[in-house]
Amino acid sequence: MKLRHFLIFLMLIPISSSICFDLKTLQCWPMEIQEMALMLTARNTARYDCSGKSKSEWYETGQKRLGWGIYYISSGLFFQLIGWPVIWVFITKFSMTNALKVYRIMVFIGLIEITEIWGNSVFPGFVAVFGEVYCTSPILMTIVGKMTMVQWVLGSSSAAFLGFHRLCDMIQKLEWLVNTNTKTGLWLTVLFFYACYGSIFFDTVLFNSDYMAPLLDPMIGKQGIIYSNNFLYFHNIIVATTLILVYACLCTLWSSREMNTSSLHVSKFQRSILLQSICISLTYAIPAISFVTMFVLPIPKWFFHVSDITYQLSGGLPFIMYICLNKRVREEFLHLLRVCRKAEKSQVAVIPLGNSTVSAFNN
């Protein structure tokens, strides 16, 4: 009887005509997704309207910086050159089980960083060379902005999780949170969806050649429009604070407790992992702090570029740190270089001489 009355009540409720159920219609999606879809098709919106100037006029609002462009592109390609071999060494030469399963997270972060370099180093280099702004290439700017935001949020939160993972390993009562690969994978999956949410439903960052930094404001000259990203603001605060606190706790625990091992080699190994983790965390903590500073303090124009340099280096410095701090990575990396050089020298040069050929080995 109660169920029948409830159904009658639902039937009598007037359905608002504003409710939209057709997911094929863009207007039925949230406003944030509608705006992103229009930006990805280079269509003007109320907040991202490029109709006020021609493309050549928009180029005049940017600034060509050949020197910085060369730096960004060359450093990005250099990071790619050393980054992929380091990741290859981790994947093929390290047994990522038991004590070494922390390397799974390092490889995950490394894959984020090596792909992020294209968006935070190589692409800004071309933007600097040609003096690009949002309205000169709205589609590309939006795609790169959304992608780099996902990569930054995912990479920095994964770095915080790396510290949390090490802390759980040292505090045995918390080890159950991360003691299986399934649990670790679940944590990283949650962080991935968290990063995608922040990128889709909040204002994106758009690289500007005048400021040489990613900005929320597209610099289209519209008055009274507010561009903000509270998600990114609080994320950077939380990540910076978490990284500092977690690794401070790790260092305190390391210095105060006795290691439950009689092997000096294992002790050095654990110290090496901790040092590598701290270095990775610093490459994320410093840009996060600088980004927060940009939000809360009036800063000079040059500080935008300095902040972006710290962000740009966060994608490549960890690979240099791995080579310098991890003996096995360094040895395997140098071995790969020797193999490549030996392969080049052993190539056969075929020199045509009349009707015959001579094969020469360049050894």
Curated annotation (Swiss-Prot):
The chain crosses the membrane at residues 70-90, 107-127, 143-163, 187-207, 231-251, 278-298, 303-323. The keyword Membrane applies. It comes from the Eukaryota. InterPro entries: 7TM_GPCR_serpentine_rcpt_Srt. Residues 1-18 form the signal peptide. It holds the Pfam family 7TM_GPCR_Srt. It is found in: Membrane. One of its GO terms (cellular component) is membrane. Keywords: Membrane, Receptor, Signal, Transmembrane, Transmembrane helix. The keyword Magnesium does not apply. It is a multi-pass membrane protein. Belongs to the nematode receptor-like protein srt family. This is Serpentine receptor class T-55. The gene is srt-55.
